[in-house]
Amino acid sequence: MFFKRSTNSRKTSANSSSDTSTSSESLLLPLLNNTKAGARSQKGSVHRQSGKKARRKMMENPYVCSLELDELSADDSIIDYSVFSDDSFLLILLLTSKGDVQAYLETSRDTKPRKNVVNIKTACSLNVSPVTVCIGSQAAFAIFGLADGNLLVTPIRLLIDVTWGGSSWATTTVIDLSLPTVDPCLATPTCTKCFVSNFPPCTMAVVANKAGNILLVDLHLRKCVSELKAPQSLHQIDILLDENSIELLVTGFTGAQWIIPIERSGKGFREVLTTCVPSDLTVLEPATMQFFAADSCGVVALDTTESIVEVYNTFHSLAHSSKRTFKVPPETWMVHAGDNMLFTVSNDNEIRSALHFGFMSSRLEYTLVRTSTNWRPLGIVAMPSRPHKLAGIFVVNERGLVRVEQSTALNLTKIASEFFFRLSPLQLNSKSVAQVANACRIDTAEFQSALIPNLLSTRKNRQLTNKELSQIYSIAKAINLSMSDLLKAFENESIGEQLLPEVLNTIQTNPAKHDNLMQRVVEMFVKRSLSAEGNMDKIREYDAELSNFLARHEHLHKGSVDCAKAGMWKCTQTLVRRDVHETKSIDTSTEVLLYIIKNRLQIWNEANSTDRLQIMSLVCHLDWSKLADADGARVCAILSAWQRDISLPSYHEMCLRIAITNSDRFPRPCQILSLVSSIHILSEKKISNHANLPNFLPLAGGNNCGATITEDDRLMIWGNFTNAQQRMEMPQMNAKSKRSDSVTNGAPTLPPPAPKPEQHLPRVLEYPGGRPRAIACGAEHILVLSSSGQLSAWGGNRFGQCGVGHSFRIANLHQVDGDWPAIEKIACGQFHSAFICSDGSLWTFGWGVWGQLGHGGRNNSNQLVPTRVNGLICKVTQIACGRAHTVVLTDTGRVLVCGSGSYGQMGVDDDIKKVFAFTPLPLGPLRVRDIATHYYHSICITEDNRVFEWGRNPQELKMRMFVMKKIRSAQLKNTEDPSSPSPSTNGSTPRVNLNLPAEIPREDLGLREVKHFLDGNIVSVACGLSHSALITSEGTLYTWGKGLDYQLGHGNKNERMEPHQVFEPNGAKWVNVSLGNNHTIASTDDGSVFAWGKNDFGQCGVLTKKNGNSADVTKKFFFQARDGRRFMPNVDESQFVQKPGLIPDVRVRNLNEDGNEGVDKEEIVDRLKASDVNVVQAVSKHLYSPIEGKCNGSIIEDEPRNGKIQKQNKYDGEDGPLCTTTALVHLIAGDVKRAIRMIEWLKTDSSTCEKSLMVLSSLVWEVMANHEDVQSREALSAAFRHVPMSDSMRKGKQIAQLWPAVWNDERVQSSLSIDEKIAMLDGFTSASKPVSCPTIPSSSLEVSSKIRVYAQCAHAEPAAVGSPPECSTCLDEWTEKVRHTLGTQL
């Protein structure tokens, strides 16, 4: 069926199948506007109407258009049409303005449609002018409304060659319908319809004309049998049929509509019309909605204002709400509803279609039908249904007939799959699958099996969005497709890695059930990384994600080689270590090593600084025992070369250790690696003097734990590294929860077994990162900083406080790598961390919900990796982290704070909840030199030794409020007591002062000074939960604050408002102090460590035994709270260490023990001298970067560029580490030029020892003087310009002998003073000439009996008293050279 709203187009009803349409939810509706898809071609041509934007976002329209009838002349047009159809038959008659009839017939027996054109005047031999057409009953005849108001009945055989048509309709007949009361010009028919009456059965025709007359014509009697009069000219009549009634839906030219009964309840039309009064007929409402007839007695209503279509099952249901509503594009004026789709026509004559397959929703996804024409449609005719095809339509327009059918390039199953993909998640179920399959008349099982492959095949060449992946996964669940099978379907299309998010979600819901998918996750991450095609940022992102996954599933151990090939080095290291542990084999380790050896250049060049550290660490930690000699030598060479690009000493130390470990198997390569690593360490050692070492922090206390750096450089920890504490319990809730667990799980859930007390005693934490320098504790985690500046983390990590890129617990100390300057100081809050770098920058990470990370704006997200704090004007010199706030000290002596201010942490009395950026503490002109915080309150020490604190423990504030409320209640009770004294004589009642705060008082939360009488300057300060401590320059320890847990060390529970000295042990000189929740840890100058306070988790490092009279079961006391009955354990005194107690077997390292570390320089020099020349040459090559076309960062050049010498301002390390040992290596290796360049930079380095430089310089001059193979003009010029000379060297003959070779070099002359030039001239002796036998001239023998023969030049001359010792010939030659070279400079 079709319906439209129009006042200027003729139309007839078209027969079609019944409407059972519902709709699917529209995902996109971008074409519901006035924008046209493209430029129009000339009128009448077929063109493409599909926008690029629509094709990209919406489902591809499955329909295409083709012309079927377009045989009219230019001045002819279609004015009316009629249709007759059933399941295998379709007949369409088109009436033209010239009286021609175009017939179009399709049957199931015909291979192609039959067409015919007949002129009515010619065929009937009558002078008639047909204006309407209607196909009669059983398609046996056709009825034409004539311009004069009469009807023409012709047999169908007259219009097209068919075999049917009864004898009753064998002749052409004109039925006279002339009405004497109607003007002839108004008698012209506007609509003609045919139906078969029920009472009695009779073939009838209905004719409407311009005068508003409705004529019922008995076609057997050939006459009008009834006449009705409408109040206006009629435009359209639709016939509404059901088993017991026939009604007319009449539409006037104004759009007003009425329903006129013809037959009802078994009564014929004569009886019904007799009782029908036209004035009683009611106009259908609303006026904005146009109603049309549909098949099966249905009615369809189009509301162009709201752009909706309402479908009613029968015309009797118009008064009820049983309807289905569909959204249509704006400006729609014609719609055709089929079983599975809707077609719409807009005012611009654009044809759109939307599939619904029986699903109802308020929106559909409409797309343009390709290659539709721009002729104005008159109506839409449904095609007969065909197997495996969507139902098509014919569009009747002013020029003829256009076929719209499913494209042959598309498969119905794929079309249905795409539609099913666009259903809402709530509609995705097995019933929906069956509904779509039945609507398409395909097998449900076949459709279900092809659903996912069809969707993936059309998307295999692009990246699926998260929404698409989620929808496909929902479909898989609807058809009961397992994740394994779904993954196979994805892999068949080579897009398996795109399912990764859904696979991860599936595993997370039930890891045990989906264990078989976990290894596939590794494979998918590898494929993702390989598909990144060198995008290292993406690969690192995938590496981090997979690392998070592996942290949760520690049993996975396969795939390390694939991860290495994909460039995911963090996961490679994790999987290799696990594989060795699981399989007890190192084959995987060897395979990874061989891959790195083979692809070393590509791997290193593609890696950034962080990746390089990871790769080097991986190579050093892999097992080399199965490497061949050649491969072992290559690995050593790789590590030797890679160290040029690494500046962290811990990695050089790592290479040195691996060289020592494998020296027996690979002696020569490991010797080279050892020397290279040692030289790098020496260079860093030269730079990292005591002034540049990280801040020394050997002692740390956490929530219920402690940690220290021992005197033998081990890490010792004790206590419980969790946030556990004694909590109040509610018996009713606990019992209820246990019952709930028993019901749901079948057995009560038992709490995890408590750790044994012995497990809380001091224990070693393995630390492979070199020599630890500083340690800090949070509630659940530890940070460790080595002397070389390498940061490591261990422990709880649920907020990212370990800074390793994920939020899972770190089972072993894990290096925190990143691109930041050298770290100098570290600090841990309860769940966040921070460190300060050498450039004064601040980096924070971990819990950030209160703004305690200080990143400004409204940034309260957790940071999983260290992130720099921007916006700080001054350099940061100290850092302290509390529970939810952070305090820093700048180089100007100012204190900055950020984070939570609920309990005064911001240093003001105002109620400040959160501060996201660092703000100054209101201290005025006072300069601060030390800060401390760990929980809620903070302390700062000014330069004049004053102590200020701010903030309060919330438990303390709540207790204060509790007392105040009790006082208020007592006062109120006293004022209301009847037994109170009688009113005063003046009638007024005495009032009690009730001026008590209703909320937490804040006047004591801000900055306040702590008065003290200390015996020296404060050198250290620390904060706990409710207590504080400091150490003076005299080694005296003072504590103050709450003492309920004996945390003050005074042997009692008294609270101290100002610092009080800790007297035990006697004579102790305190060096370090750190505070935990309710315990204190401190160390003395002899390395002893003491602890006292709360010890329920062994945080004091010892076991405390219960008193003899204590019951085995801890006693509890109950109290009635507002939200129910609660109880708390009655803690006995055995859970405390009441006075400072020594922690056995723990001795802390003190600062004075932090001497020189690393390799010994003299030892390295001796090893170099004893090494083979080839070894030293190999070491030399590994120390410098072989960059072609560069002068390696030196000012030495063969020739000046553009007449000027190019000079770099800073050494870039291309000749190797900047130290004298590097220059010595180059010198021994014979690379004198490089050694001289190194000396050039060493002269400008303030950390270079002058004595070592002069010794090195003398060696250079010695080599230059004694080895002619290095005496090139370039090398000599460089040496005279840059190598220092002592006075003795300058006056010596060796240097004077070399100078003449370069004395005409302007650069050499400009670098020497006149005195230096004269000194070398004075020390000059002519070069010796090798003479085996001197020749004596005969003239010399004749003149004198004595001659002098010069061995240096073999000249002979008479000996004379007072003659100079030099050869006169050579002297003249030398003088001439000097004069020629120096001119008048002397």
UniProtKB/Swiss-Prot annotation:
PROSITE patterns in UniProt: RCC1_2, RCC1_3
Keyword terms, alphabetized: Guanine-nucleotide releasing factor, Repeat
Gene3D superfamilies, alphabetized: Regulator of chromosome condensation 1/beta-lactamase-inhibitor protein II (2.130.10.30)
Signal peptide: none
RCC1 repeats: 737-787, 788-838, 839-891, 893-943, 1034-1085, 1087-1139
Region (Disordered): 1-25, 37-56, 730-760, 972-994
Name of the protein in question: X-linked retinitis pigmentosa GTPase regulator homolog
Species whose genome carries this gene: Caenorhabditis elegans
